[in-house]
UniProtKB/Swiss-Prot annotation:
Pfam families: Arginosuc_syn_C, Arginosuc_synth
Record's subcellular location: Cytoplasm
Record protein name field: Argininosuccinate synthase
Superkingdom of this protein's organism: Bacteria
Chief location category: cytoplasm
Gene field: argG
MF annotations from Gene Ontology: argininosuccinate synthase activity; ATP binding
Amino acid sequence: MSGINKIVLAYSGGLDTSAIIPWLKEHYDAEIIAFVADVGQERDDLEGIEQKAIASGAVKCIVKDLREEFVKEYVYPTLKTGAVYEGTYLLGTSMARPIIAKAMVEAALAEGADAISHGCTGKGNDQVRFEGAVAALAPQLKVIAPWRLWDMRSREDLLAYLEARDIPCKATLKKIYSRDANAWHISTEGGELESTWNEPSEAVWQWTVSAEQAPNEPEYVKLTVAKGEVVAVDDQPLSPHQILTTLNERAGKHGVGRIDITENRMVGMKSRGCYETPGGTVMVAALRAVEELVLDRPTRAWREKLGAEFSHLVYDGRWFTPLCKAIVASANAIAEDLDGEVILKMYKGQVTAVQKKSPNSLYSEDFATFGADEVYDQSHAEGFIRLYTLASRIRAMKEQHQAIGGDHTHG
């Protein structure tokens, strides 16, 4: 295709993207640069990945370490909004896509590429997330999505394609599960999960143990929160990524952070997935505990509205939008007073905030007791209740008059 001389491919080293490299070369007669975003996925997935890319036909392989930036600039802002998609999903895959796409775009512009390519299927959410980010950041770049273009439909087709071209690949014909991992979570789909009547086997879970296998003794962890961000574990200051990896290991041993959900994809289909977010689940519990102490009722309600809206923005691939920036700004303002310390108990798949304190706490033992009237005079409640219930009383009086045939709506 004319006008495309260099393509940057989001490369994972797996079967799909290994086949995409030669396919792009054959169909576009262009140089292919493989781009690998390290967002904290399994270390085995990155071993020898540059050599794999070159062996598949890439002229170059760029590996970018995005782990700290991912947690600091994408995970933490999302946490401050309180975003949870459809009540349970902590947006692990969704949060990683915008930083990968942004880094890809930067690489493409630096390398003088004309297009980017990805291995997302035409049935999933990720194609929208990647291409939405490109449209927002560099609309002049063309996007090539081979799964929407080629006639290969199965692992057998891909393996045969590579074999015919003498391209080495360690992938096998049988792949039970489809997995995606980053520093925040790991997702598993496929296999027995394709039937919602099947209970996930233990082979599904990678980072967490079952409640039955978890230790019989609880473990406690202390988190320090500053302006809505976790900054220390057991009084030890760590970087955001270090905090997350530490909590992943400790919480995973207790089976914390497992969910099995059937979610609504933005393309209209439902999909079932098992997600493990051990460290993130502990972080969320700590932040909610500090919020309970610090935020007044209307501010807490507003933060919950922000989270509900932001969950859809992130899930739907609209990170680089004015609305996203506005919600993050509002969440940051709310988080200014979210300072505190929380001790959490991890036990048999559950995490519970058992101790919490904040210098900005609105809770006071003195104010909450029933014995003291210096702050709260109980007699004042009568007037408040009469005003608070005024609309209800007017409605009831109107209904009573109508029931006996009277109409006093006119003066």
